[in-house]
Amino acid sequence: MSAPSPLILVMAGGTGGHVFPGLALAAALRERGCRVSWLGTANGIEARLVPEAGIELHTLPIAGLRGKGLASRLLAPWSLGISLWAALIVMIRLRPQVVVGFGGFATGPGGLMASALGRPLLVHEQNAVAGLTNRWLARIADQVFAGFPDSFPESVGCRTIGNPVRREISNLAPPGERWASRKGRLRLLVLGGSLGARTLNEVVPAALSSLPAEERPLVRHQAGERTLDLALDAYREAGVDAEITAFIEDVAEAYGWADLVICRAGALTVAEVAAAGLPAVFVPYPHAVDDHQTANAGFLVTAGAAWCIQDVDLTPQRLGGLLGGLRREALLDRAERARAEARPDAVQQLAAACLEAVPTNRRRAA
């Protein structure tokens, strides 16, 4: 009787920037015959997305420690203790062969308990500036991976492999092939994230209204559920036509359609823009911890594939001046530069590392 296939425990939660790379890894591991379980929280985006992917979700009662009030800080040791105990129970019950952490609230307690029980622990940091949890876990992890260079000190021994992105994005045709027959007005994609971005919703339509009507690009704008009405009103008042939705379900199709994207600079977004091969105007979220979105954007700005405008500096005049001077031929050059920086094999490299970390007596079952 053959042994069951290896069980890999993915730890990620809180935001899509942590969860989507974890889901990409889970899909790659399943294709290789592995079983996958997930450790997260009940309040993060993983509570919906992970069960929808058919993955068993285990949750910890923990929240972030940074930027909290005094009461939350005083209760933090108690909350952490409960979460460590809950993580220990999960580890003992599941007995995973390998544990992989992507960051987020549950990753800290889970990673500590995995290490204490001698389970191989792998850590992947998505941002150019490593988050607090991953900085801690990097000290005890068996292997550390990153989406951008220099996220950790050299002493950590980190491998830069890029960020896992969804296959449908990596599989898009190269920019030159996609744009070969395009004529007429430019195609502008505006992504405010699933929750929207108030600055983009207000400034983009005002900037477009400053352009002659015949020179305005075709626009698709993801406004977010909370700020959809604001965006609809802003475009209406500006007299600018646009396709405005709360959320774009098929983002790969939207990337394939666009000539240019205006967006925040979360690690996953930057990785997807590179994988798709798109020039971008990044507007980093101004309240991101350690200003990591500016560092993320710098990866493609340095490559000559993108622009970066700080949120406070994004005015209709500045954005309108930039958009008014763009031509598709010049954008294609930036698109190809972006595609050259992509790491389409990131998820396969990470999946291979997981299997290599499986104890030898279990590896044959994969």
Language-model segments: which ranges?
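A short, well-ordered alpha-helix in the C-terminal region of glycosyltransferases
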Residues: 331-344
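Donor-nucleotide binding loops and adjacent catalytic segments primarily
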Residues: 44, 49, 53, 174-261, ...
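C-terminal alpha-helical cap of glycosyltransferases
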Residues: 343-366
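Conserved nucleotide-sugar phosphate-binding/catalytic loop shared by glycosyltransferases and other
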Residues: 5-13, 30-82, 225-227, 310-312
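Active-site-proximal region of nucleotide-activated glycan assembly enzymes
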Residues: 35, 45, 56, 115-175
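Short amphipathic alpha-helix
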Residues: 18-29
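Acidic donor-binding loop of glycosyltransferase active sites
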Residues: 96-98, 256-270, 278-279
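Glycosyltransferases and closely related glycan-assembly transferases
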Residues: 86-100, 107-122, 135-140
